[in-house]
Amino acid sequence: MIVREGSAEILVPEVYHGPGKRGTGFYNADQKINRDITIEFIKKMGIRNVLDGFGGTGIRGIRISKETDSAVTISEVSPDSYRLIRDNVERNGSQASVINDSFECVLQHGAYEYVDVDPYGSPVPYLDAALMGVKRNGFLGVTATDQSALTGSVPHKTRIRYDALIKNDTFRHEMGIRLLIGYMAKRAASLGRFIDPLISIWHGHYYRVFVRVRKGFEGAGRMMQNLGYVNKHNLLSGIYQDMDEGPVWKGNLQDNAVAEAVLASAGHKAFNPEENRLLFCDLTDIARARHTSLPDIESVIDALSSSGHAASRTMFSPTGIKTDASCDLVESLMMDTLHRRSPA
């Protein structure tokens, strides 16, 4: 089957949607926005050489080689997938080099300005090699599809893989991304490195984060101050369980200037400067706890803005509001909104 994406035309054994599966070079159509954003990120940051560490069909590396000025290496451990990538590189007249070896072995032979980690499942086994294989002040792009562990929906996986406790509730996807970044930060610190999150996205079945990697134990020490525990009971009493979750990343999820430029160029609508705030107020949770109906979310956001507060929707919940106001005030304004719309 022939698939066209961006400037590439590749041969694939099958087209797949969803979290992916093991197999020779399957093409995941749901990851197109992931690849679009990656290409715009590479352009924006002026990256000159790239390792696509998990080649699959070769679509990511081929698109990068054709749509940016970067030199590209594609690595793939599967011999069958390697042959498929090599054929697709030739089909596209791409200058990408293709290596039939493991991700870790490729990184032992040289460092890259940008390393892309997009494996089947969890990125955890590959993070140390990736962090060590990035050049000074280089970049990592990491995809995680192991949401059952990151969101706490399978608690023993969360404990074993990420050494953390996460409650599977309304906040699970924000906590999942913060757990992923926090784990990356811990691994970086252990290697004398530190990271700065530049873009963080939840898109369906996967999380995608881009970070800058720097060296130095002093910087690592400062970075580790962003790790800690979250107790949602403090958001709004009487709704959320009194328990400490984490450790997770409590710092910024993105560099607003980088995220805005990259996501706009990629045609992605998710940029929101308020996403850096830790957690949000969820109107569905409040309505359920107070046994009332759900108001129009935009009316509550308008009321917050009129009160002088920053407020916006969040990618993590269709009824969540990121704001500098307390959730107590959000609840009060929500009730006012409901009363105003009620018939006299």
Curated annotation (Swiss-Prot):
The keyword RNA-binding applies. InterPro entries: SAM-dependent_MTases_sf (IPR029063), Trm1 (IPR002905), TRM1_arc_bac (IPR022923), tRNA_met_Trm1_C (IPR042296). Keywords: Methyltransferase, RNA-binding, S-adenosyl-L-methionine, Transferase, tRNA processing, tRNA-binding. GO terms for molecular function: tRNA (guanine(26)-N2)-dimethyltransferase activity; tRNA binding. SUPFAM superfamilies: S-adenosyl-L-methionine-dependent methyltransferases (SSF53335). Residues 1-334 form the Trm1 methyltransferase domain. It catalyses: guanosine(26) in tRNA + 2 S-adenosyl-L-methionine = N(2)-dimethylguanosine(26) in tRNA + 2 S-adenosyl-L-homocysteine + 2 H(+). It comes from the Archaea. S-adenosyl-L-methionine binds at R35, R60, E76. One of its GO terms (biological process) is tRNA N2-guanine methylation. Its EC number is 2.1.1.216. Pfam families: TRM. Dimethylates a single guanine residue at position 26 of a number of tRNAs using S-adenosyl-L-methionine as donor of the methyl groups. Belongs to the class I-like SAM-binding methyltransferase superfamily. Trm1 family. This is tRNA (guanine(26)-N(2))-dimethyltransferase. The gene is trm1.
